């Protein structure tokens, strides 16, 4: 199974990807996570350091693939998850899609691409040009990471459009959305009502999820010394279980941009004000109590 993880920049894709990778490994699967970002920090919480990229390694070997060994590019991470960082071209030059293609080509040369039960591509931001949409060419499923915010859902909609386009020529399906670190999900529900797709999980606003990234650890590693975080790991295990069940997934029909803009902005500007309703109910109740005292 091959999974591509997308989402708005800074939404927590890498943190989520690393925890999902470990959750899949905990279910007995052999997992490889491939970071597809020039920052090459996708696997940081799995390995604890920034591992050398495939592009760096190929450059050092003058692009002689026959001189590259698996241990030159594949690093063992926490929980038995293998890690690869594709890297990227110099800033302002080259194409990220080419880098992803070279990464897959090298892994095939090393007979490593087909050795894993699950390969997870963690892809740069919400850039869905032909280059950074390249991992969708290899994926069985796409997962979109979002939160309950306007910008993240707008990006999710553009990614959904890319999935639909790639699904024309590849056996690709959208497995669903994952809400990350959000105290509410009303806007997520509003979006999936307009653009039907599964919601695999919504992780609550837990500060330890953000802190884990700073510590360079996954939640699964942190729970070894902080048992109170065990319940957080269950969210990722639930996502893993759904993926391993080989869901049918969907080919999404994205909402037109202007229509989505109106839908989401209207939800912000004209929210259902339940707080006012509850306040009015409290006032009415107090008035009834006061009246009863007057009668007595």
Swiss-Prot record:
Pathway participation: Porphyrin-containing compound metabolism; chlorophyll biosynthesis (light-independent)
Keyword Coiled coil annotated: no
Q: What is its EC number?
A: 1.3.7.7
One GO BP annotation is:
light-independent chlorophyll biosynthetic process
Task: Return the cofactor note field.
Answer: Binds 1 [4Fe-4S] cluster per dimer.
Write the record's keywords in alphabetical order, separated by commas.
4Fe-4S, ATP-binding, Chlorophyll biosynthesis, Chloroplast, Iron, Iron-sulfur, Magnesium, Metal-binding, Nucleotide-binding, Oxidoreductase, Photosynthesis, Plastid
- Reaction(s) catalysed by this chain's protein: chlorophyllide a + oxidized 2[4Fe-4S]-[ferredoxin] + 2 ADP + 2 phosphate = protochlorophyllide a + reduced 2[4Fe-4S]-[ferredoxin] + 2 ATP + 2 H2O
Per its UniProt record, the required cofactor names are: [4Fe-4S] cluster
Residues annotated for [4Fe-4S] cluster binding in this entry: 95, 129
Cited InterPro entries:
NifH/chlL_CS, NifH/frxC, P-loop_NTPase, Protochlorophyllide_ATP-bd
Extract the signal peptide range.
none
- Enumerate the subcellular locations listed in this protein's record, separating them with semicolons: Plastid, Chloroplast
Annotated residues that bind ATP are located at: 10-15, 39, 180-181
Task: Provide a Gene Ontology MF annotation, just one.
Answer: ATP binding
The similarity comment for this entry is:
Belongs to the NifH/BchL/ChlL family.
Q: Report the protein's function.
A: Component of the dark-operative protochlorophyllide reductase (DPOR) that uses Mg-ATP and reduced ferredoxin to reduce ring D of protochlorophyllide (Pchlide) to form chlorophyllide a (Chlide). This reaction is light-independent. The L component serves as a unique electron donor to the NB-component of the complex, and binds Mg-ATP.
Q: How does it assemble?
A: Homodimer. Protochlorophyllide reductase is composed of three subunits; ChlL, ChlN and ChlB.
Name by which UniProt lists this protein: Light-independent protochlorophyllide reductase iron-sulfur ATP-binding protein
List the source organism: Mesostigma viride
